[in-house]
């Protein structure tokens, strides 16, 4: 059997076979792994949130038991998810001066805010759908007159950032905090 040394015809033939026969299934498998990982991350964040709720419970009960005495001091405790600084973190990486769903300083910010407002942070599926929608908006131009035109994520990045860094940010959920 001949070795497929880099730069040889056999090497490039093997590369073409991989592209034709295997790449799409590898891509589908990688996307499935990514989706499962983000769902697991959401569950782990939910566990942290539930821990906060458990820790707040005795204090909340105390406040409820002494609400008459504390009426001059309105205290409310609850644990929930919030978007933490997502606009700054996202647009630190995205160039709003190039074609894409987030093109335009005000328009891009408004589009991201509208997407965030649709999310019910109490529901894991809603958070997962947000992540998928954000990815979709990077791949397809969702502005009204662009009819979902395909966009390259790399061209939407600011200098110094990679697609991997952007996806680590999006799928890492660092912007959702309990």
What is the predicted function of each stretch?
Residues 1-177:
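Extended, charged coiled-coil "arm/hinge" scaffolds of SMC/Rad50-like chromosome-maintenance ATPases
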């Amino acid at each position: 059997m001949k070795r497929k040394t880099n730069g040889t015809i056999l090497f490039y033939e093997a590369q073409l076979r991989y592209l034709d026969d295997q790449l799409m299934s590898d891509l589908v498998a990688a996307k499935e792994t990514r989706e499962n990982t983000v769902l697991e991350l959401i569950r782990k964040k939910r566990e942290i949130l539930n821990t906060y709720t458990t820790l707040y419970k005795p204090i909340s009960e105390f406040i409820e038991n002494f609400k008459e005495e504390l009426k001059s001091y309105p205290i409310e405790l609850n644990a929930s998810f919030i978007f933490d600084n997502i606009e700054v973190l996202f647009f630190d990486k995205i160039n709003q001066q190039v074609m894409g769903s987030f093109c335009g300083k005000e328009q891009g910010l408004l589009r991201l805010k509208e997407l965030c407002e649709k999310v019910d942070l109490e529901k894991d599926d809603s958070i997962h759908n947000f992540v998928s929608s954000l990815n979709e908006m990077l791949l397809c131009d969702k502005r009204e007159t662009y009819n979902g035109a395909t966009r390259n994520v790399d061209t939407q990045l600011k200098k110094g950032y990679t697609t991997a860094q952007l996806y680590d940010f999006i799928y890492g959920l660092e912007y959702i905090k309990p």
